């Protein structure tokens, strides 16, 4: 996830709890990492469609709700802009206006079709 995390647990089985938390984070990262070409999210980004696992579907559905609640200020389809600015690779650059316009034309969660299991 390229995110620094710190876990603190107290109690009799605190080490086990931390180990389980780390395993769960790794499992979810395996589903959602855009830096892993075999992740569920990467496959959907590459094909433009796909059947979602239960975990991904729950996050996707909540993301779509937040998109609606914020009038589109939060948008699940922002990945083309992230790529353009170089966030996934760490090779950052300021895009040209025409590049921004092209990438922005791909960002619009309202165009996503969702039936509760499959996103298109």
Task: Annotate the PLM regions.
Residues 1-120:
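A contiguous, well-ordered beta/alpha segment that forms the leading edge of an enzyme domain
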